[in-house]
């Protein structure tokens, strides 16, 4: 019996909750996994759960089923089973009580800094600063997470025409159904350069129809979008475009400073609020603060509000209010 116990080994089970259908969310999960395996738990077994913003956002206790549990690039939870947390969104807390819980329960494994352009880079900096972990082979991943999540593209053409492998991968991450594809990509990201990931047959099979959909979405938004007073508005009710490229409006209307769009899906009715990174007029409104008034959030330059499925009329009312405020 002693021999059995000596050789029998149960691997650490680590559950990672990440922002689903988001390049930075996937890259954050990948970098975090490499960090944990490289510095904390070398034999950890990773399980991933994609998280999406919903109107009634709650963290079910059953989500935290690991020996250790992590949330990356997504909102804070006060669940006692949460071990690790990294986020960079201004709107990182569901309630004031959650913010107070974070402040009064300090942990070196739970960190928040909205000054970072990407959560991936935030994890990279803290992993090196505190634990001495580095992964030079993931520098490309961190670089593109900063570009994509921080909207650091040189021009709308780069953001929309998808020339770089990272942009092609973003199309697949944002447009694929369910979470299985994104979770495969998270595992690929830990060991492959982006060019190699995009060349994988399973990714190519998804990319081709998604690219056709991307081209079609440009035509739909061209028809639906209207620019007035520096605000581009459009309503995608009736179209399956939940994962459309958010820079298309500025590609089509470079004179616009902001966008406000309504896009229903199976699990929410979404109001997207964004600002043009290349605008000739400097955006002056904090979009996260505006969205927070309606139960949403985000960053200063980009935010969103999630209502229940079917609340299209309410979404249109809110969108009109926000558009009027942005024109003022």
Please report, for each region that a protein language model flagged, where it lies by residue.
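Glycine-rich, Lys/Arg-enriched anion-binding loops that position phosphate/diphosphate groups
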Residues: 152-244
